[in-house]
Swiss-Prot record:
Family matches, as InterPro entries: PPIase_dom_sf, PPIase_FKBP_dom, Trig_fac, Trigger_fac_C, Trigger_fac_C_sf, Trigger_fac_ribosome-bd_bac, Trigger_fac_ribosome-bd_sf, Trigger_fact/SurA_dom_sf
SUPFAM superfamilies: FKBP-like, Triger factor/SurA peptide-binding domain-like, Trigger factor ribosome-binding domain
Broad EC category: isomerase
Signal peptide extent: none
Name this protein carries in UniProt: Trigger factor
Keywords tagged on the record: Cell cycle, Cell division, Chaperone, Cytoplasm, Isomerase, Rotamase
Length: 447
């Protein structure tokens, strides 16, 4: 090894002491070391690599492995040096981690400070690089005996069931045509219309339709259109001008003034469902009793979901307030970027990212201590419950999961969080609190 070794460096007695290291700085979890490898070692390894390459090297005019060695050196020296440098960095960095007893680390960064010029005669400069990394923090184990949570249970009353049934009447009205020719359309009525829209006397794309159904007050058309239809009668025709919003999604129409002509072909009003049993049958139930049972199940499911989210937030708040340890800044920075994409804002994004990283590390430590592992079903449940929708089929999400490592880590983290929190909530002390459905909704609305 070259004698050109930095002062205060520690020489490592491994593989003929191929490297020395010097501590540059340690700040909480951040570590920086300077590693020096003798030029003689690099030169020997490069020569060995070139000899390996020469066995199969090809060049026009020469058979495989028969290229003159000086041509091998000329054509492959840089490639060999790159290979040796990378493998040396891998070995020395890994060996140093063992020496300084760093069990795990995050995002190591290498900055090459100097490379030996192997073309120089005489003593050559050493290979020197800086290794920067963050070590994993010592994460405490969650103490279940110290956690006390509130388990909120909702009491479903007849009033709640009636409110649910009434909401069905509002959401799924049955419409009938109006026979009275003098009837004037009002908010909530369904109109069957023909319409045309023109800009500078030219019909624009999507600006006309026949027998189009629109419910007044639904906001189906641009602002002001449905207001113009209010008060019209069956068979009546009307023309009016409206201006498209400046931020309208179709750029060619944004901010443009259009002339509309509308004819009302029919006016339909919401029909009274009649008796409860008749109403239940119209929306697919055997009788009113079946509908009420369905309502109770739906309300119960909604209350259970709100209850679970409330107790989960209470647990998260407790862990965030009662456990403190150094967090790796690179991990927090990455999570902060994800938070900003989710929320569309930088406000409090750092604080939220720190909270998420802290909880994730607590859950990871807890899962190791309590031997909680993920199954394929745990992963699939997260994919199905959080990522599948009418517009995003399972096959597309699962294909993305298999091909994207970052998405895999995200889904696995969510699955582990769910499994660990469920385990903790099941084991800790819980005080039951009975509330009304309205009170539960208010509690949920405040989180």
């Amino acid at each position: 090894m070259s004698s050109n070794i930095p002062q205060n460096a520690v020489e490592v007695d491994t593989l003929s002491s191929i490297y020395t290291y010097k501590e540059l700085s340690i700040d909480k979890l951040k570590h920086e070391y300077e590693i020096t490898v003798g030029s003689n070692y690099i030169e020997q390894k490069v020569n060995s690599r070139l000899q390996e390459i020469a066995k199969n090297a090809k060049l026009p005019g020469f058979r495989s492995g028969k290229m003159p060695y000086d041509l091998v050196v000329t054509n492959y020296k840089n490639e060999a040096l790159e290979y040796v440098v990378n493998s040396t960095i891998d070995y020395c960095s890994s060996d140093l981690m063992k020496k300084i007893e760093v069990k795990s680390h995050i995002y190591p960064k290498v900055d090459i400070m100097s490379l030996p010029n192997l073309n120089e005669e005489g003593e050559k400069s050493n290979f020197v690089y800086k290794l920067s990394f963050e070590s994993m923090p010592e994460v405490p184990v969650i103490d279940l005996d110290k956690i006390n949570l509130k388990k909120v249970e909702a009491r479903i009353e007849e009033e709640d069931i009636k409110g649910f049934v009434d909401s069905i009447k509002t959401r799924f009205p049955s419409f009938v045509s109006v026979d009275d020719a003098s009837y004037q359309a009002k908010n909530g009525d369904k109109l069957v219309i023909d319409f045309e829209g023109r800009i500078r006397n030219k019909l624009f794309q999507g600006g006309s339709n026949k027998n189009f159904k629109v419910t007044l007050g639904s906001g189906t058309f641009i602002n002001g259109f449905e207001n113009q239809l209010t008060g019209m009668k069956k068979g009546e025709t009307k023309s009016f001008k409206l201006k498209f919003p400046e931020d309208y999604q179709t750029i060619s129409l944004a901010g443009q003034e259009a002339n509309f002509s509308v004819r009302v072909n029919d006016i339909q009003v919401a029909e009274d469902f009649g008796g409860d049993d008749e109403m239940a049958k119209k929306i697919g139930f055997r009788d009113c009793s079946s509908l009420k049972n369905h309502a109770k199940e739906v309300i119960g499911g909604q209350c259970e979901e709100m209850r679970d989210l409330l107790i989960k937030k209470e647990l998260f708040d407790y862990l965030d307030a009662n456990y403190s340890f150094d967090l790796p800044t690179d991990v927090v920075r990455q999570e902060q970027q994800r938070v900003e994409r989710e929320l569309g804002s930088k406000d409090d994004s750092c604080k939220e990212a720190e909270r998420r990283v802290k909880l994730a590390m607590l859950f990871m430590k807890f899962s190791t201590e309590h031997k909680i592992s993920l199954t394929q079903n745990d992963i699939l449940n997260v994919i199905v419950n959080q990522y599948i929708s009418k517009d995003v089929p399972f096959d597309r999400v699962f294909k993305h999961f298999k091909s994207d490592r970052q998405f895999q880590e995200l889904v696995r983290g969510q699955a582990l969080e769910h499994k660990v929190t469920s385990y903790i909530i099941e084991k800790v002390n819980k005080e039951e609190q009975i509330v009304s459905v309205k009170e539960l909704k208010e509690l949920f609305g405040n989180i």
